[in-house]
């Protein structure tokens, strides 16, 4: 029963974990794939490259706004860029390095991403994301774990032991951040999935509650409520 629910959770919210096409050894020599790779690099490189050098906050500008809400969000902007970027590129990185030009590019970004991840949890790093400073660390952890679950060999497998321990501690610290009765249940559930996969100790009831709640919130035609009420936003795909 437990493993069936985990499978359902991954199938719903991490489809690429279960269905990634086996394209190892494929070079980026056709037009569509070449454009796709170029787009990945264009989007991901500013985040991954700068974080790997401990210069993300220094080099990447953030939008300014006079609104109080936007000003508060400036604090978490850099952190949010990391989890989402890694969740996006992880399936590609998990293909691993090979002798093609694309495989060599992957090797470069695997090493860069692992260094970036290490910096993000190093208290001595300028780009350290303090796990107790904001509830948004729960959201970022969920997206980051989504990426790590999709690249367990190339990302988690290549992280140093100290960084792994720091991530586990950071994820456990988010348990004090109680989610609202909405899409945030998925974030807490994803953290527990990460702890199960990489830490061994997890809370099954958190995952079950998220699945049961979203099943009850189904509105039809592939759309889920963000809570009991209908609310169409990009979290439907998450």
Residue ranges and their predicted role:
Residues 1-5:
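Positively charged n-region of N-terminal signal peptides that target proteins for export
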Residues 78, 89-92, 102, 106-238:
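Aromatic-lined, polymer-binding surfaces characteristic
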Residues 24-80, 87, 91, 111-116:
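Low-complexity, Ser/Thr/Pro/Gly-enriched N-terminal "stalk/linker" regions
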Residues 6-19:
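Bacterial N-terminal signal peptides
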Residues 6-8, 29, 85:
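Intrinsically disordered, low-complexity regions enriched in Ser/Pro/Gly/Gln/His and often acidic
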Residues 17-21, 165-168:
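Solvent-exposed, well-ordered amphipathic alpha-helical segments
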